[in-house]
Regions:
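N-terminal signal peptide c-region/cleavage motif recognized by signal peptidases
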Residues: 16-17
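Alpha-helix C-terminal capping/helix-coil junction sites
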Residues: 50, 109-110, 191, 228
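Short, conserved catalytic-motif segment at the N-terminal edge
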Residues: 27-91, 113-115, 132-136, 273
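Short, surface-exposed loop or secondary-structure junction motifs
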Residues: 122-301
């Protein structure tokens, strides 16, 4: 399944850098060893994707040596209203929430709150007796075996915990992860469903970062969003990176599009509750909204 979002942080313009970029030092591309001509080609290539209907719009930035040398917004933030893309547009960054979670965790590690090889059951005892599906290809709650080894904190960071994906059929059936639940409830639900593999034996892209987010709350004694705001976003001056898009920011939120069978972009919502509504679930694996320049600051670390 392919989802089209207008965020192009992977390009971290020959266009002039406007007032929004004043928070970051700017420079001429050639002064940091880049090519103005080459960046102009980047603009042409991105515009070609917009013109072909592959994406609705894009905001692209290039930074080198801590200096912003390119910033370009192309296409539209919302096709239905024909709202143009802007440099300060906000995007649902989905799984790019995960590196923020890992950074917050490592800040707490530096302060001595935990060790990377600690079993997570030391802090979340509900995981102490978790078992493993006998056949992970056809998970059955009645067909399980004893687990070999414990989930370590490091397993959560490298996605080797054995936990499943929020979209796995058994997690959906068991109601493991719903945005109407609290993070503590989701973690409790995940602990009662068997693992898909023994910890540390297999890479699996699933709820690991969500569990890590709960550990951050346990270690810090704060909510996850408070830790993010105080320990990550404030020091980096990431003023537009949030879990909830308030009314003032909503006018800048880009619509997510997915191509239909004919390749036409259609609005698509992956979540049952939109980001413009406050929800109980704030998790480490998904959920942040950010701007290109905010995430460019994070990417400079």
């Amino acid at each position: 399944m392919r989802f089209i979002t207008p965020l192009a942080n992977a390009l971290l313009c020959l266009a002039s850098v406007g007032s929004i970029a004043q928070e970051l030092p700017t420079a001429n591309p050639e002064s940091v060893g880049l090519s103005s001509e080459g960046l102009a080609q980047v603009t042409q290539n991105l515009q070609a994707h917009v013109d072909a209907g592959h994406i609705a719009g894009v905001v692209a930035a290039v930074l080198k040596d801590g200096k912003l040398v390119y910033l370009e917004s192309l296409g539209q933030r919302d096709l239905e209203s024909a709202s143009p893309m802007s440099d300060d547009a906000l995007f649902r960054v989905y799984s790019m929430t995960r590196p923020v979670t890992s950074l917050a965790a490592m800040i707490l590690w530096e302060e001595g709150h935990f060790q990377l090889d600690d079993p997570i059951s030391k802090y979340l005892p509900e995981f102490a007796s978790q078992r493993v599906f006998s056949d992970p290809s056809t998970p059955d709650m009645a067909q399980t075996r004893a687990r070999v080894g414990d989930i370590k904190v490091a397993d959560l960071m490298r996605h080797t915990s054995g936990l499943g994906s929020r979209s796995s059929s058994i997690y959906v059936e068991q109601g493991v992860r719903l945005r109407s639940l609290t993070l503590e409830q989701v973690v409790s639900n995940a602990a009662r469903v068997p693992l898909f593999s023994d910890p540390g034996t297999r890479f699996g892209y699933g709820l690991s970062a969500t569990i890590l987010g709960r550990l951050i709350e346990v270690w810090s004694g704060q909510t996850l969003d408070s830790v993010f705001a105080e320990r990550v976003f404030a020091p980096l001056e990431m003023q537009d990176t949030v879990f909830y898009v308030d009314p003032e920011r909503q006018k800048r939120l880009a619509t997510v599009y997915r191509p239909d069978a004919d390749g036409q972009l259609r609005p698509h919502e992956m979540e049952d509750i939109p980001f413009t509504q406050q929800v109980p679930l704030l998790e480490g694996g998904v959920g942040l909204v950010s701007s290109t320049l905010d995430f460019a600051k994070f990417s400079q670390l």
